[in-house]
């Protein structure tokens, strides 16, 4: 089996450990965030950032207007890039990050009407450019199908942590540069998909936004890895970006005073109880039936949540209702 060249140093392992710790805190906070609003906001940021890296000049506000179906005055190609990116991100839940067929399908949507060979591997020579400077010359087109098959086989079978695999895949993808256009945006999308297999919370994390804010370091990491002949510099760069993204979003706005806002750790059952209270008026009997436990068990859990100042009872015992504070 093909083995991409990389070295796991202490910095990489330290970053991976810190990310693993922070992602769990992020998931807990996410439970009480407005996921629909967060998903939409991050989708806009992700699309704007990923396209801006590739030279799209539209502002985040204009990208938002296009996504919301408003008419805008802008170059047609740039508008099409936004619409295509949106259509591709809508496929996110259905795409298998371990499937070459799905990669080609996603590229076909992403580059529809932009390049004639959308959805197909390139038949011409390509390279990675930082402005007008070529920082990496990609392998000949005839080698692309075999190289991609090897890369996907490694991705599926490797025992490395998915967090690290996602970074290695991203670099190897850019090294191969399998398409005539759209390699950057596809590489970033595919890393997000791989990360999503490790933890679905990554659907809510606009990693592309952090890369956009550090474009020069992004290209520097690719160049350093190419010179070194192994991708440790790129792995470190991407892990640092993921960590920075998690730190940036660790304070997701939630209603002030909730357990999540105060870093109180809740059990899975307690989180389910909170979700049910948020969904509408419920009684202890209804919660017990839904969770398939005794009413006495739920009564104890509710008392704990009241003691933690997470929930409260509004009104009388007979006519009142439970609320999340």
Tell where the protein language model's regions lie, with residue ranges.
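FIC/Doc superfamily catalytic core
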Residues: 1-325
């Amino acid at each position: 089996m093909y083995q991409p060249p990389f070295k796991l140093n202490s910095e990489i392992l330290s970053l991976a450990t810190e990310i693993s710790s922070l992602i769990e805190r992020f998931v807990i906070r996410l439970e009480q965030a407005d996921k629909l609003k967060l998903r939409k906001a991050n989708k806009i940021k992700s699309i704007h950032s990923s396209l801006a890296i590739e030279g799209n000049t539209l502002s985040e506000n204009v990208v938002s207007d296009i996504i919301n179906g408003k008419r805008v005055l802008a170059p047609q190609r740039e508008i099409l890039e936004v619409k295509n990116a949106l259509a591709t991100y809508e496929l996110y839940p259905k795409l298998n990050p371990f499937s070459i067929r799905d990669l080609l399908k996603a590229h076909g949507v992403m580059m529809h009407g932009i390049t004639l060979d959308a959805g197909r591997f390139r038949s011409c020579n390509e390279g990675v450019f930082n402005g007008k400077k070529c920082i990496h010359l990609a392998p000949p087109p005839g080698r692309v199908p075999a190289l991609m098959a090897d890369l996907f086989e490694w991705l599926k079978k490797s025992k490395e942590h998915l967090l690290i695999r996602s970074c290695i895949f991203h670099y190897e993808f850019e090294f191969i540069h399998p398409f005539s256009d759209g390699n950057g945006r596809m590489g970033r999308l595919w890393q997000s998909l791989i990360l999503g297999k490790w933890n679905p919370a990554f659907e809510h994390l606009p990693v592309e936004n952090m890369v956009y804010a550090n474009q020069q370091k992004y290209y520097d990491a690719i160049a350093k890895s190419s010179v070194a002949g192994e991708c440790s510099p790129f792995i470190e760069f991407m892990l640092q970006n993921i960590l920075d993204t998690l730190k940036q979003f660790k304070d997701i706005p939630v209603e002030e005073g909730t357990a999540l806002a105060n870093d109180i750790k809740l059990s899975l059952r307690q989180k389910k109880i909170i979700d049910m209270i948020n969904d509408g008026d419920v009684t202890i009997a209804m919660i017990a039936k839904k969770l398939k436990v005794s009413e006495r068990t739920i009564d104890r859990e509710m008392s704990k949540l009241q003691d933690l100042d997470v929930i409260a009872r509004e009104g009388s015992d007979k006519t009142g209702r439970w609320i999340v504070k």
